Amino acid sequence: DRPFRAAFMSPMQDHPISVPLWRQLQGASSLLMAVRGGQSMTVALEKVEGVLRPGVQALAFHALRWLGRAEALRQQLAKRPPPPEADALLCVVLALIWQEKDAPYTPHTLVDQAVEAAKHSDATRHQASFINGCLRRFLRERDALVALTDRYPQAVWNHPQWWIDRLRKDHPDEWEDILRANNSRAPLILRVNARKTTRQQYLQALHETGLEAAPVGEHGVILASARPVPSLPGFDQGHFSVQDAAAQLAAPLLLDGLGAQLGRPLNILDACAAPGGKTAHLLELTDACVTALDIDARRCERIQQNLDRLGLDAQIRVADAAQPDTWWDGRSYDAILLDA
């Protein structure tokens, strides 16, 4: 589909791209292993090198979206599961390759790059031939193998069986619609930086580059089709941030005339602030001293990067909000935002 393909430099082409596909496949496989191990995808992404992050993120999310199908196909191709690293790589590629329609790369490119990914890792080097054999068998027997997996609800709905069973029990008339909606791709929604431009001006900038968009909420813009975020007009100039429409409600609700009521700049705490979307929104809407707090130092770096791009400034602190004695200066806050 277009949003997925847009994350890559050269979809459906076989010439070299700026970041080798095999490296992106390795990164996506590592993220899949992290999620299988109980880690948040958001946290795992923080460890991915910046130049790799857009492609790796797109591959990993795609793999998770089709993981039920990919795991069912892997079971048909190999009755005994391979080591975890090889299994993750195989599932990522099967998620990419099982549908021919709108695939981001041609089948032989994916197979070739999957083998390269396996060869370039000590954990999967000895599984390269196995991965190559599984994928080439799938290409030969695609229709039959997909039909075999259609009997498994996890493959059809790409949800765990316990989740499917629970939905069928709790929502007997709507469970299929719920699963379909849950499998749909979320739209790309931006928040316009009111310090830099107006929403109408930004909609015009999108229109001039051939992108269809519409207003949503008070400061939001929803794109008709997703694009790589750094390629959107005004990215480097800090004209917008990516933020869901629901998340854009937090800052206005918190402020709600508070500055006018007090008649002075506000002192605000954003606890658990990373990656900084709501911190930035607060600073865009009012003159305030905002303390952006997060327990993860790496994620605090992301807050700083985002604020720098937007031309905003906050007091960023690496600390545990639950232990104020370690970071609080004793000055009362006019408002506290906690999204946890």
Region roles according to the model:
Residues 2-340:
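S-adenosylmethionine
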